[in-house]
Amino acid sequence: MFLKHPAWLWLKKHDKGKLPPVDDALQAMFDDGHEFEKYAEQLFPDATTVGFSFEENNYRTMPVRTKEVIESGAKIILQGRLEAGEITCIFDVIERVGESEYDLYEIKSSTEVKEDHILDLAFQTVVLEKAGLKVRKVFVVHVNNKFERTGDIEVAKLAAQTEVTDQVRAKLEYTKKQIQHALMVAHSPLPPDFSPRHVGLRALDEWMAIYEAMFPQDHPHNIFKLTHLNPQIVGELEDLGVKTIAEIPEGFKLNSKQQRQVTATKADRREVNKENIKDFLAKFEYPLYFFDYETFSAVIPPFDGLHPYQQMPFQYSIHRLDEDGTLTHKEFLHTQNSNPGLPLIKQLVEDIGEKGTVLVWYESFEKGRNEELGLMFPEYAQQMKQLNERIVDLMVPFASGWFVDKDFFGSASIKKVFPVLISEISYKKLHIKEGGTASRVWKETFLEGENTDQRDKIAEDLLAYCGLDTLAMVQLFEFLRTEVS
């Protein structure tokens, strides 16, 4: 928390009400972590669990209970807490390898070791060694993304162990200095600077949610709306006294997308390369199929043939536009607790025909899912390959800078582009407004059996959301065609 932003720690101690509650998306991430943790702990049979919960008495008594388990001679201990002066940590696993000597394991539901894992383990190592334990080796237990489910989950194949002892040891002195700084911040009655320039560990988006709630920005095109923003740029602009994108001086170092955004904002008009867009549209072959998937993923693959976190389509929408202007709609939504792949692919090959351009938004996503479906169901591999050969990315004019509007805020996302150009229809009126919610709600309802009294309504909401994605593409295509005609 402190390493993400010093003021985050200060707020946690002095003004918790300023911190946002855990939302559904973040809770889903926590749930994934807990699910993997339950499997990973099976790698340590006969372990003694101290146990952690947010109940005050449970947390308060953890150090005493942990010491009792250590003194009992337990070889492996799960979910313990130790204190050393003013600092404390909860560890996932320690394994006794000698007299007061232990290996330390951190369980993470990511598919690789990350910088914050090393720093977290360095902090734990400092606490454990100050508390009288010697740490021999340090490991991260993480998800093996090469794992493919076949029958029951084999934990030894699902989880990978990566030793990080040297990386952790290299961070110990840095960590000790940061601990002293953190304690000074925590004890101070005054907060540190709240500026996003002080963000670390790639936590800018997380901190901006807190910062903008505390300090609402009056100008819609303030510097915090610059695309690909990072803390260094924030600091440099603040030092120059720049508060809005239009004030960014000539010669300020920006990438190409940032520069396009700044240019469009200063000009206060759309920049349209009609020739490039006209050439792009001329290559389309009717009928046109506007196509979009909705997918789910899970850290523990629920079906055979799936990898951890593999994006599996459970829904699609297709709007077909004929050359005479006739528009028709096809859709699919899997509502059973079973692998949606085969029923989806069977209907898809019927609905999307064999000829005509297939238009998507961000082609690598749909193409990737089609390749995976072809691998999972080899009898359809050729049809998926042919489908991918027909795909064209309707995002290209916006991502390539052929059509730029300052109100896109440097983004080519359909959620940014569509409301600026087409005002008659809005995602705001839908109960499900973005793909993350669609994925989470489908998984909870149709895979995990929750929301049983709302199944029909949720299915209706999912169909409405996915249907609007492809209708939005139709309308954006029509807009572009009119713009360059």
Model-derived segments and their meaning:
Residues 1-100, 232-257:
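Metal-dependent nuclease catalytic cores that hydrolyze phosphodiester bonds in DNA/RNA
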Residues 74-80, 84, 88-92, 104-107, ...:
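Conserved DEDDh/DEDDy metal-dependent 3′-5′ exonuclease domain
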Residues 97-109:
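Residues forming anionic-ligand binding surfaces in small-molecule and nucleic-acid pockets
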Residues 82, 276-354, 375:
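Conserved RNase H-like, two-metal-ion catalytic cores of nucleic-acid enzymes
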Residues 104, 290, 315-317, 359-360, ...:
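Structured core elements
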